[in-house]
Amino acid sequence: MTEIKTIKKRSGFRVMAELIGLVKPLSGYMCLAIFAGLIGHLCAAFITILGGYAVLAVLGVQDKITPMQVFITVPLLALFRAGLRYGEQSCNHFIAFKLLALIRDKVFRALRRLCPAKLEGRGKGDLISVITSDIELLEVFYAHTISPVAIAFLFTLILCGFIGNFHPLLGLLALIA
């Protein structure tokens, strides 16, 4: 009697967790990407926030920062934002392409072991094309999903804390929203 192995269907969450687990050897680059992205987003947010402070200063409502300080700080924040964005994207794509090379290597090594005849004959181009296109889809996940989600989470917490400095209920309302 032949034994038939059943393949367990994995949930999308489990697959995503396993894909994230592959990043572990490159976690330093991932932390750098998250840090650069977070600081860059804070720079972008504070361009607008400081503009609001400048308006309030002109109206005489606040005196913590002068309009001249805002006019000096805003262009610097914009320059920092540009450099940090570049750094974040560079780290994300470095991670993505390193992992794609690793995954491709593992997949093709397994294919050579499991079905060497299929890789020699007709249709090998179709098989390789399908596998390569599937692996390429992972680039989006590694370069454009993991760190942006972490950045959004941390950015939200920081800005809710900032808003909460004005009044704790405002910070809580921002967090709920």
Feature map (PLM): residue ranges:
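Hydrophobic alpha-helical transmembrane segments of ABC transporter permease domains
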Residues: 35, 39, 43, 47, ...
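Juxtamembrane helix-loop junctions of ABC transporter transmembrane domains
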Residues: 12, 44-52, 77-120, 124, ...
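Transmembrane helix-loop junctions in multipass membrane proteins, especially transporters and channels
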Residues: 61-62, 90-97, 160-171
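Alpha-solenoid HEAT/Armadillo repeat architecture
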Residues: 21-25, 60, 143, 147
